[in-house]
């Protein structure tokens, strides 16, 4: 997924100013759109995939501002905690018999404690929890954006997208880890698959300690950014507000209202990434699919079958049944045939 970002990091010197401005706008909108769409999803894999798309938008946006080292730093830290998050999600989906809907989960902290610990810590790293892997890169990116010469639109997109990241992370934890177990009542979960657990616990160490280690390795001198107290605390404030909104949105009443008839169009618009599937997938696939369906219906299942396989089979079957009917030892048939032959012979003699 991140190969394109890595290539752009390697060839960052060929990006001109106009291309960087266009890239900044598109990547910021992608980051905001993916974060907003993840808050309306109930598929565990889709939530994590949209989270990856949002973080890719963050990398591309900071790369378009000229900070290629910072984009590479976030690429590495994001790879660590997102790999752990995908492993935890795969373990949970496997234990729930390939069920991906987070509404069927709940109270997994009791049934799968080690997996949930790894999932919680990777979620907190994704949110930018202080001193985890994601904190060092995300906080530095937000401070660089606060210090840079960007307009208020890009500035708000960065911080609102950060709040949305915390929002869907807490929503995911609320549905999957807390509450009641909503799967089959007689279904038992297993948290003793040590092949997965050894890998997850090893990745957990990297998620906790790799942020500071990579910062020491990538940047030769410590980066010190002086900002006013309001801007320094803005990232923390946005994260806290995003966590609170994620908790409120996860409640049943809010979820029911958002899917009601009054607000369904808004939920559809935000959940389907601003009608992106309708523009990119559905509209492009509609004409070829309808054309192939009509050809299949009219030709393959229509005239081709009538004059081809089914028609020949039907005519041969009818002829065989007629001949078999004639060959039955029936006195009436023999008398009728004799009369027909006599009439035909009489007609021939008259000619």
Model-derived features with residue positions:
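Core, highly hydrophobic multi-pass alpha-helical transmembrane subunits of bioenergetic inner membranes
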Residues: 1-351
């Amino acid at each position: 997924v991140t190969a394109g970002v890595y290539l752009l990091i390697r060839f960052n010197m060929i990006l001109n100013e106009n291309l960087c401005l266009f890239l900044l706008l598109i990547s910021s909108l992608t980051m905001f759109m993916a974060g907003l769409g993840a808050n309306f999803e109930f598929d565990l894999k889709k939530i994590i995939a949209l989270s990856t798309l949002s973080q890719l938008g963050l990398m591309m946006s900071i790369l378009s501002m000229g900070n290629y080292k910072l984009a590479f730093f976030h690429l590495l830290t994001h790879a660590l905690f997102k790999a752990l998050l995908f492993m935890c999600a795969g373990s949970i989906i496997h234990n729930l018999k390939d069920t991906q809907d987070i509404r069927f989960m709940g109270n997994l902290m009791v049934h799968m404690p080690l997996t949930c610990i790894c999932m919680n810590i990777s979620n907190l790293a994704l949110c930018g929890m202080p001193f985890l892997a994601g904190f060092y890169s995300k906080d530095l990116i937000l401070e660089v954006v606060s210090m840079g010469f960007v307009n208020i639109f890009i500035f708000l997109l960065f911080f609102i997208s950060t709040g949305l990241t915390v929002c869907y992370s807490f929503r995911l934890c609320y549905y999957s880890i807390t509450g009641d177990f909503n799967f089959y009542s007689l279904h038992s979960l297993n948290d003793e698959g040590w092949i997965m657990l050894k890998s997850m616990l090893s990745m957990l160490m990297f998620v906790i300690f790799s942020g500071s280690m990579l910062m020491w390795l990538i940047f030769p001198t410590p980066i010190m950014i002086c900002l006013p107290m309001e801007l320094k605390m803005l990232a923390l404030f946005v994260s806290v507000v995003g966590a609170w909104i994620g908790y409120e949105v996860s409640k049943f009443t809010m979820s029911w209202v958002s899917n009601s008839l009054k607000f369904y169009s808004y939920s559809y618009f935000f959940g389907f990434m601003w009608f992106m599937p309708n523009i990119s997938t559905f509209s492009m696939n509609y004409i070829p699919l309808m054309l192939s369906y009509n050809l299949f219906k009219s030709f393959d299942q229509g005239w081709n079958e009538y004059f081809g396989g089914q028609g020949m089979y039907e005519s041969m079957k009818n002829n065989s049944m007629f001949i078999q009917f004639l060959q039955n030892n029936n006195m009436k048939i023999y008398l009728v045939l004799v009369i027909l032959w006599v009439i035909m012979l009489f007609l021939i003699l008259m000619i």
